[in-house]
Amino acid sequence: MKLLKSIIAICVIAFAVPSFGQSSNIKTVKFKVDGVCGMCKDRIESALDIKGVKYVNWDLKTHVCEVTYRTDKVSEETFHKTLTAIGHDTEKLKASDEAYSKIHGCCKYRSEEVQDAHKDEHESHDHD
């Protein structure tokens, strides 16, 4: 009986220690990313679908990107570099003019005309 209790205790410790260590490697960050439409949302979230990222959501209304990731696999700096490489400014880095020029015309968030067009489009549909 004593042997059985010892084996159970060892098993509990063996399973508890690895899971405890993993949870300390998980972090969630939120940061601003410029964009204006659903295409931007798809592009931003797809770009951050990388090894180590567990969850990503970019909110069109607030422009806040929330990322949950493993700190032992990827860094927050990688997110900013990845997004600027595909043409989206973040609160820490600005996309190059070359990268920005490659995004679709309706996604040109630096243009006041495009921003206004998306505001008009949003205001004209139902909010049920």
Regions found by a protein language model. Give the residues of each.
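The N-terminal extracellular segments of secreted preproproteins, especially immediately downstream
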Residues: 10, 36-39, 105-106
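Processing junctions and N-termini across compartments
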Residues: 15, 31-34, 100-101
